[in-house]
């Protein structure tokens, strides 16, 4: 039995790359895993089928979606905030909507998810 056997894990941003590796590892260690995805439903469906985890579409830029996801996931033992975006180029030339989205995903989502958990 592993340290995460029968533990409940939520991974924000878990459908690809590092997030998918996190999901796979927690499942391998016996956890019940729910993960969110935003823009890659095919990858999310494949990962859920492969691992027996649960994929939920939720935009981390949407505060209400993040809060609902945490609430709907039930009592959590582990919260992993993997969702994040980056902007490239001159900071003074960035579109203000893109900067707002970056802050909603990278700063606000972790805050709201942590408070709700």
Q: Language-model features: where?
A:
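A short, exposed helix-loop element centered on a Lys and neighboring polar residues
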Residues: 114-115
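Substrate-binding pocket helix/loop in short-chain dehydrogenase/reductase
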Residues: 90-91, 95-103
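Flexible N-terminal pre-Rossmann segment of NAD(P)-dependent oxidoreductases
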Residues: 1-10
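Conserved glycine-rich Rossmann-like NAD(P)H-binding loop of the short-chain dehydrogenase/reductase
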Residues: 31-45
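Conserved NAD(P)H cofactor-binding loop of Rossmann-fold oxidoreductase domains
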Residues: 83-88
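Conserved glycine-rich cofactor-binding loop
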Residues: 15-16
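The beta1-alpha1 cofactor-binding region of Rossmann-like NAD(H)/NADP(H)-dependent oxidoreductases
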Residues: 57-68, 96
């Amino acid at each position: 039995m592993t340290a995460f056997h029968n533990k409940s894990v939520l991974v924000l941003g878990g459908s690809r790359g590092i997030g998918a590796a996190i999901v796979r590892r927690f499942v391998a260690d016996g956890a019940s895993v729910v993960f969110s995805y935003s823009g890659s439903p095919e990858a999310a469906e494949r990962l859920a089928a492969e691992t027996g985890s649960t994929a939920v579409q939720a935009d981390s830029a949407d505060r209400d979606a993040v809060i609902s996801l945490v609430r709907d996931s039930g009592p959590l033992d582990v919260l992993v905030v993997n969702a994040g975006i980056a902007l490239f180029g001159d900071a003074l030339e960035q579109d203000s909507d893109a900067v707002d989205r970056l802050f909603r995903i990278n700063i606000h989502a972790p805050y709201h998810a942590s408070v709700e958990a």
